[in-house]
């Protein structure tokens, strides 16, 4: 789970950066 947290954050960050 701990390893999945950063993975999810990275995906969200990419989406936000792409959307912004």
From Swiss-Prot:
Entry-annotated residues carrying Glycine amide:
20
- The answer on whether this UniProt entry bears the keyword Secreted reads yes
Signal sequence span per UniProt? none
The UniProt record lists the keyword Coiled coil: no
Q: Per the UniProt entry, what are the Gene Ontology biological process annotations, in alphabetical order?
A: defense response
Q: What is its main location?
A: secreted
- What GO CC annotations are associated with the protein? extracellular region
Annotated coiled-coil segments of the chain: none
Domain of life the protein comes from: Eukaryota
Cite the record's tissue specificity text: Expressed by the skin glands.
Q: Which compartments is it annotated to reside in?
A: Secreted
- Give the record's keywords alphabetically: Amidation, Amphibian defense peptide, Antimicrobial, Secreted
- Function in brief: Has antiprotozoal activity against T.cruzi.
**Name of this chain's protein:** Phylloseptin-O1
Write down the species.
Pithecopus oreades
